[in-house]
């Protein structure tokens, strides 16, 4: 289930880089809440609380400002490329019971058989879910899977109420295989045996 976070903000009517700089000096972040065909709402949010809140993937926000309350999800986050501080946040207003499409990070758990290793082929999987049930991550189990096994999008077990929403259900999400260096190190002792045998006559000849 999505993490629900409440933020207390203020409406803003001034715009521009100079205004944004002044807000950041005051430990505030400018943000915009978009709402379909309606006029967007322009707000300022507390920097520390907002920065911490944005660590949660696909969180559901309740943003209160000047007597208004809007429920929203993050649409885009702009960061300073050098300082890595948040400069602006775009939100998308949502309604209770609404289903939306989101990109969810993929993680693996479990241990494949033998020397096989799990490789994540796509970092995020697109799914559709109720705004109150947005997953923070998709976990793919690779426990006991053998070399050469692929887990396709259609095979991923999703949380209850979450639907797959990708163009190609046959797309590989995780691949299990033995790395080349592991194969070579396993074969190396066998390859060295004939060389050791060949050295014996040379030693006898001395």
Swiss-Prot record:
Ranges of biased composition (kind: Low complexity): 184-206
Region of interest: Disordered: 168-206
Taxonomic lineage from the root: Bacteria, Bacillati, Actinomycetota, Actinomycetes, Bifidobacteriales
Quaternary organization: Part of the 50S ribosomal subunit; part of the 5S rRNA/L5/L18/L25 subcomplex. Contacts the 5S rRNA. Binds to the 5S rRNA independently of L5 and L18.
A cellular-component GO term for this protein: cytosolic large ribosomal subunit
Function: This is one of the proteins that binds to the 5S RNA in the ribosome where it forms part of the central protuberance.
HAMAP family found in the cross-reference section: Ribosomal_bL25_CTC
Domain of life assignment: Bacteria
Full protein name: Large ribosomal subunit protein bL25
This protein's UniProt keywords: Ribonucleoprotein, Ribosomal protein, RNA-binding, rRNA-binding
GO terms classed as biological process: translation
Coiled coil: none
InterPro entries on file: Rbsml_bL25/Gln-tRNA_synth_N, Ribosomal_bL25/Gln-tRNA_synth, Ribosomal_bL25_b-dom, Ribosomal_bL25_C, Ribosomal_bL25_long, Ribosomal_L25_dom, Ribosomal_uL5_bac-type
């Amino acid at each position: 289930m999505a993490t629900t976070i409440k933020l207390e903000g203020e409406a803003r009517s001034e715009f521009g880089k100079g205004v944004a700089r002044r807000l950041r000096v005051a430990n505030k972040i400018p943000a915009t809440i978009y709402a379909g065909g309606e006029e967007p709402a322009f707000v300022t949010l507390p920097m520390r609380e907002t920065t911490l809140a944005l660590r949660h993937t696909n969180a559901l926000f309740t943003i209160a400002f000047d007597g208004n309350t809007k429920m929203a999800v993050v649409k885009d986050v702009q960061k300073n490329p050098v300082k890595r501080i948040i400069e602006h946040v775009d939100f998308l207003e949502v309604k209770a019971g609404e289903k939306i499409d989101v990109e969810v990070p993929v993680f693996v758990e479990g241990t494949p058989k033998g020397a096989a290793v799990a490789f994540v082929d796509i970092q995020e999987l697109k799914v559709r879910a109720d705004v109150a049930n947005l997953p923070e991550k998709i976990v793919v189990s690779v426990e006991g899977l053998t070399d050469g096994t692929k887990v396709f999008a259609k095979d991923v077990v999703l949380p209850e109420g979450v639907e797959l929403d990708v163009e190609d259900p046959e797309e590989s999400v995780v691949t299990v295989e033995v790395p080349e260096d592991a194969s070579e190190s396993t074969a190396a002792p066998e390859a060295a045996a004939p060389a050791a045998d060949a050295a014996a006559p040379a030693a006898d000849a001395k």
